[in-house]
């Protein structure tokens, strides 16, 4: 693994988007350099961990950031005065899980005692402090494990990150780049800011139809499986619906008027938003990208199947149809304050319809296909009564 400039560059762009630090245009930014170096130091420890046999640990512990083997998201919070606090952006040092894992794997217990008992105590002490292990295979099914996420309540964390994003977006502009840089390069910094919440969307979606579990063994007396509380799932859905709000997805006019076509030598790359408008910046595709990310994460085929089954086992739980109706509500009844936001709402509607159509046609579970098909037919009847406002979406339903 090479810890090169590309990794530093990514953290720089995240920080520049959030902080817009170049008010005068030529400021030095040692705080951003330290931000990026803190990530490199942590990543160095992460790779050493792999070298000595440690796997990724994505467990969301009440004890906080317990492992350098996690994929951490930079922690940026709001102060009371509206400023952003990045003093704890990345953790320093080795985590409690890392210490427990190395002790378990490498410690010599001197004194002729019972090594097995000593090893069990290492694990029990870790367990008692909520220092546990979940890895790559766990992140889609349970909100107990997530990549690039902070906190233990995914709904609250998504709302918090949307608040941070909103404040940073309200201040975003030419102060995100240095003097002499083409104004078009604001887009490079805009992308990670606009999508600041993207990984937390994945984490929050894992609450929906989520399953709590541990890798229990016979005789350990531990509860192996439980469903995520309906109240938590409903809060998660509320937070996810916020990410589809036209007012959250609309770019400020000041930003739209600041990004010209790219000059010679500054070609388009995959780090920029797609566009349908030729060389001109596209005001709608950022909303399309963000909305697609939310909707596609909520309506994965396996999550839809779990929603069907959890409603079957416990009618108080949100089911697939409940989630579909919330998405339709956001797509067709969400508040739009102007023609731009109306166009964004229509974009969200198109994203929702396309994803539900995909479930209706290709989901492996028969019940998912049936419920998705019925929901679309019911929606088509409602939209037919909304003519002409429902025309464009009715065409998608055909």
How would you name each of these model-derived features?
Residues 48-62:
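Catalytic Zn2+-binding segment of zinc metalloproteases
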Residues 34-43, 59, 184, 188-191:
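Soluble non-cytosolic domains of exported or imported proteins
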Residues 63-398:
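Conserved catalytic/binding loops enriched for acidic/polar residues
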Residues 2-4, 55, 59, 70-72:
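Generic beta-strand/beta-sheet core signal
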Residues 1-51, 76-78:
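Metzincin-family zinc-dependent endopeptidase catalytic domain
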Residues 28, 39, 54, 87, ...:
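Sparse, context-dependent recognition of short Cys/His-centered cofactor- or disulfide-binding micro-motifs
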